[in-house]
Amino acid sequence: MGETAGERALSRVHSVRERIGHSLSAHTNELVAVFSRLVNQGKGMLQPHQITAEYNAAIPEAEREKLKNTPFEDLLRGAQEAIVIPPWVALAIRPRPGVWEYVRVNVSELGVEELSVLRYLQFKEQLANGSTDNNFVLELDFGPFNASFPRPSLSKSIGNGVQFLNRHLSSKLFHDKESMYPLLNFLRAHNYKGMTMMLNDRIRSLGTLQGALRKAETHLSGLPADTPYTEFHHRFQELGLEKGWGDCAQRASETIHLLLDLLEAPDPSSLEKFLGTIPMVLNVVILSPHGYFAQANVLGYPDTGGQVVYILDQVRAMENEMLLRIKQQGLDITPKILIVTRMLPDAHGTTCGQRLEKVLGTEHTHILRVPFKTEDGIVRKWISRFEVWPYLEAYTDDVAHEIAGELQANPDLIIGNYSDGNLVACLLAHKLGVTHCTIAHALEKTKYPNSDLYWKKFEDHYHFSCQFTADLIAMNHADFIITSTFQEIAGNKDTVGQYESHMAFTMPGLYRVVHGIDVFDPKFNIVSPGADMSIYFPYTEQQKRLTSLHTEIEELLFSDVENAEHKFVLKDKKKPIIFSMARLDRVKNMTGLVEMYGRNPRLQELVNLVVVCGDHGKVSKDKEEQVEFKKMFDLIEKYNLSGHIRWISAQMNRVRNGELYRYICDMKGAFVQPAFYEAFGLTVIEAMTCGLPTFATAYGGPAEIIVNGVSGYHIDPYQNDKASALLVGFFGKCQEDPSHWNKISQGGLQRIEEKYTWKLYSERLMTLSGVYGFWKYVSNLDRRETRRYLEMLYALKYRKMAATVPLAVEGETSGE
């Protein structure tokens, strides 16, 4: 359908070209001053903070005050990057999350030209190529496949996909009696290992179904509410109803009443509630191949951190929710959850060489380890997450065989984690026809600036050509995508979201993505995790406190000994502690925290700094970690921090870590998470759950977790002096008024209770699985056309790139 005249007029009024034209006529001097400074930088790319710096340098403060909230300022504030190829400056402008416009200004002639995504990317490629590449370039465009598919248009709808989907498809599918047949067929198809559930062959039409439901409702109304299913199952079978309606008369009556309401007057919330009550998810497979995946003694190993903790906490909550639902549905079925990871025969004292390992705190959840293989046999040693690509296709086939043996059935849901796990999950779900969920944890493209444009520079070490392609394939294949925060999908008003950065990008010489993903797609859902409440609980709960660990903790923090577990000795042991715990890599920015602390003598007077990262006991296999390790020592020496800092090796005992957070609460300290980008921020959740006031990066998930100034504070890792001044202000105020510390601590605890618990997470995940599974069955939501396109991208592009990644050589150290 074409645009109306009104829509065209509206579009013209709001076009970026016209907005710049108006700014040019109203603020010619200012615009020329700013753009001339940009051009004077020479050929290159400027990030938002650099554009702001040039704006501040070009326009005096008094003039900037007059320009506040004008279209001119909005234009520059909305610019996410500037591509400078004199005399041209091209801007990528983001008026709001998920909405982009592109424009090019000729600074010499003051000409303005609006650009399509394609033309903007072509212009940008000149930075890498030196000139426009006239050869045919592969363009990836997923837009046409979704053109007829519904999508919301408001930024506030991003991440609430299931609500939008239910509203749209309910009205589309249930507009008359005939259109209800897909629901009937869906219920009739329900079975588990040959056992019929919900409906049997007696129900052949909607009329028969409604009649049976009314008779069942009448029968149940004469029974006590707690009558078990076994006492009315014969009557149900006569009516055509099988197991799955409920474990007692009251619950079965509620389910039947819900379905009758749906058949009479369908509405989205009733549909979601009904789908949440019927048995749909009984077997789950979770993919997380890379790193050292185990329950103990692995945290801090290369590529092993928050994702492992997330999944172990996730499966405990999921199993509890599955067991509860299965019981309430009146089924005698044992659910199974398999966490599939890579087997590491060179396990280094961990259980990573063990094929099957039961997850503690569960009854029916296991870690299933499947090795990587080559023609020479099993690959024994750890391989960096950046080098796993050549193994994954064969690995998927092996995994399919192993899970078939373990489950004796197809899984009902496959969840991928991170790029490698998501690709394997995608291939597996495609093969088995199973509902596929993606959890990114972190998309590397946002962590390494310009890693798409200059991918060739990164290729030897990071192999981003494979990774970014795998990410595109997985996110477009997924039935639904879970993120922990809105930030992951679409950032905020100032920063671009992880998924949003995949909407349009270019990898010169490889391919150009003109439409990679749509952040308004209803497959996106925000489901925030929590911390394990048995380990992480408030410091005020004295009866639960693990005081027996305090001697060990004091040794860790304060002993005068330097060894493989801790370096440097604190001089004044009574001062509050700034505490931080993360992997030692560039993005986590632990060295940035040390530098921030080192540059502020007043902060050193007020508090000690304790960092937990790396391993003093062994040389890292990871190149990036080696660089950061050396940098840390250099900074401690440069700022003469001995006596003010304690550097502790990575701690793998989560129980003790929980008490360590609480011990630092006792000392009225604070937790700082200084990452350049953090997808979610599990340590932020852990610290806040223990009651520790938290300062965390403004880039990524923590900015959403923390309400600034209420439940913690946002810091900018690119502005060390401002961040350290904020910490000085906090601890200074706490010295004058100790209740201020309590206020922020309580604010953090309240925030966690409202939004970040595993119980809320597991309830939502199970409901989403049911809803998307249903819509996949009854509609074209499986997006067959898209999947054919993805097959071509995988077969013709990804496989060739993966073949160029060198295989690990046994006996050598991977990543060296």
Swiss-Prot record:
Residues 280-757 are annotated as: GT-B glycosyltransferase. Abundant in developing endosperm, low in aleurone, and undetected in coleoptiles and roots. Also detected in crude extracts of anthers and in immature embryos. Its EC number is 2.4.1.13. It catalyses: an NDP-alpha-D-glucose + D-fructose = a ribonucleoside 5'-diphosphate + sucrose + H(+). GO terms for molecular function: sucrose synthase activity. Keywords: Glycosyltransferase, Transferase. Pfam families: Glycos_transf_1, GT-B_Sucrose_synth, SUS_EPBD, SUS_N. GO terms for biological process: sucrose metabolic process. NCBIfam families: sucr_synth. Forms homotetramers and heterotetramers with SS1, all three possible heterotetramers are formed. Sucrose-cleaving enzyme that provides UDP-glucose and fructose for various metabolic pathways. Belongs to the glycosyltransferase 1 family. Plant sucrose synthase subfamily. This is Sucrose synthase 2. It comes from Hordeum vulgare.
